[in-house]
Amino acid sequence: LMEAADRVDSTAGVQMAYMKRWAPRALKPLELRLPALLPGEGRATRADAVEIAAEVEADLVYLDPPYNQHSYLGNYHVWESLTLWDKPETYGVANKRVDVKTRKSAFNSRPGIGPALEAVIERVKTPNLIVSFNDEGYLARAELERMLSARGPVRVIEIAHPRYVGARIGIHNPKGEKVGTVGRLRN
């Protein structure tokens, strides 16, 4: 259902905001498809990463934590509602869940991200840990490397990537008037 919803959304990549005009794909019918599954055991978990990290034991762990004030709950609130099937009270043009305002993660605050990520890095049981992180995040690269080096050798692979859409189009006020300037275009 989540994949089907993703194929017909009208967003610029995340669900925190929507396009001013309907995207052509949003007018297509919702089509459920059986996803391609890899053979073998698998597990899906909906939990706080800090709380569940000690239970994770794997050959390889990939972490993609939030890196600024934008929560994954706010960015992907439609998927949260689909998985919970709870029909929550919503607000705004994007119809975000009201609990987006109160369900905050330590990863979404400057003082909280360091201790939270360090706890996950320390607790997860894996010989191979991959961490994806943005250079505009609350956590400095040197601090992230320090945390990771406590586990062993660290190899950094930098990948230039286009910045999020808002950075490419500039900052606009609620009336739609451009009030900011476009910054650098790549991370």
Region spans (language model):
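SAM-dependent nucleic-acid methyltransferase catalytic core
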Residues: 1-76, 87-103
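Hydrophobic/aromatic beta-strand patches that form the interior of the parallel beta-sheet core
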Residues: 45, 130, 155-157
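Short, glycine/charged-enriched secondary-structure capping and boundary segments
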Residues: 59, 75-78, 144-146, 171
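A short, conserved alpha-helix within the catalytic core of class I
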Residues: 71-80, 112-117
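C-terminal catalytic and target-recognition region of SAM-dependent MTase-like enzymes
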Residues: 139-187
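Conserved Class I SAM-dependent methyltransferase catalytic core
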Residues: 105-152
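Long, charge-dense
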Residues: 83-87, 169
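Conserved beta-strand signature within the Rossmann-like core of class I S-adenosyl-L-methionine
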Residues: 86-94, 127-134
